[in-house]
Amino acid sequence: MRVLVTGGSGYIGSHTCVQLLQNGHDVIILDNLCNSKRSVLPVIERLGGKHPTFFEGDIRNEALMTEILHDHAIDTVIHFAGLKAVGESVQKPLEYYDNNVNGTLRLISAMRAANVKNFIFSSSATVYGDQPKIPYVESFPTGTPQSPYGKSKLMVEQILTDLQKAQPDWSIALLRYFNPVGAHPSGDMGEDPQGIPNNLMPYIAQVAVGRRDSLAIFGNDYPTEDGTGVRDYIHVMDLADGHVVAMEKLANKPGVHIYNLGAGVGNSVLDVVNAFSKACGKPVNYHFAPRREGDLPAYWADASKADRELNWRVTRTLDEMAQDTWHWQSRHPQGYPD
C-alpha cells in the first residue's frame, strides 16, 4: 500500500515507517520537524531497506495535504503528527487545540478532497480519564481527560466517529497507546526529545548517560506495591508492528475500529528504574518528589481485543525496553545530529 505517515520522523512515527518499509509498503512522510530532526530520514531508509519520500510541511496546510494525497495516490493515512506534552498543554492549550484538533480537521478535509478513506489515528489512553476499574477495556465510556492534550485526543476521536457515521464507507482505526518506550534494536533509532524529556524512560536514559543529575519520582505514597505510580509500558517496536497490522487488516473495512495497544501489565516507576539500572550496569540516581496533580495511581490496558481481532500482541519485555533504550542512548548520547 501507499501510506502517508504524518509525523513520520518523530519517535513512534519513525519506528513505524521502518516496519512499513520492511513489510513492502511505499511510505510518504510529512513532518514539520518541530519535534524531530531531518537526520533520522537516512536511518529510516537504512533500517527499512527502502527509500521513503519526505515532505517538510504542516498538516494545517490543507492545499499541500490534498496535493500529496492526490499526486502520490495514497491508500491509507497514519496520523501521528501532533503536540504531545501533557504539562506543556496546560500552559499552551490553544497551540494544542490548533495543532491536534484543527490540524486533524484540515487533514481529513484534504482526504475527502482526494477521496482517501482509510485513516489510522494515534490516540492515547488519556481518553479514558480516571476509570473506577482496571485494566482499561475499549468498551469503557471515555472519561474526562485532565489536560488539554488528553482532551484534544478525545475531541479528535469524537470528530472521527461522527465523520464515519456520516460517511459510512470510511475505515477509521483509533489506536489508544499506553506508554511507549524502548528503541530500535540496532541502537541507531530511538526517542530523542527536544529539551527536557517529558517521559520517564528517556529521562532515566539521560541521567544514566550523564546529561541529567537525578530523576525526580513524583509520589512514593500511592496505594501500589512500592508506593510509586504504575503504568503499562509498551516497546515502541511492538507499537509500530500494531500499526502495520491494523493498517493491513482494516484497509477498506468500513467502521470505527478501537484498539488498546499496551502490554496488558502494569509496572511501577521503580520497576522501570531497576530494569534500566540492570541494562546499563550501574545505579540510576533518583529522588522522591511530591505527587503531580492529575497523576493516577495505577492503570494498564486490556489488550485482548487487538490479540483476538488483529492477531497482535506484545513480544518484548520491560528488560528489553530498557536494554534497547540504553543501547540507543549510549551509542548516541546527544541523540540525532542536528
What are these regions (language model features)?
Residues 1-183:
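N-terminal Rossmann-like NAD(P)+-binding domain of SDR-like oxidoreductases, especially those catalyzing
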Residues 38, 168, 178-199, 210-231:
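Short, flexible, glycine-rich and Lys/Arg-enriched loop motifs at helix boundaries
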Residues 200-338:
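C-terminal substrate-binding subdomain of Rossmann-fold SDR/epimerase-dehydratase oxidoreductases
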Residues 11-17, 40, 61, 86, ...:
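Short, electropositive, low-hydrophobicity segments enriched in small/polar residues
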Residues 1-2, 91-93, 144-145, 189-190, ...:
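A short, structure-level motif marking secondary-structure boundaries and short turns
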Residues 97, 146-154, 190, 194-198, ...:
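Short-chain dehydrogenase/reductase
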Residues 39-42, 50, 63, 198, ...:
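Generic alpha-helical secondary structure signal
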Residues 57, 69, 96, 144, ...:
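Pocket-edge positions in alpha/beta enzyme catalytic cores
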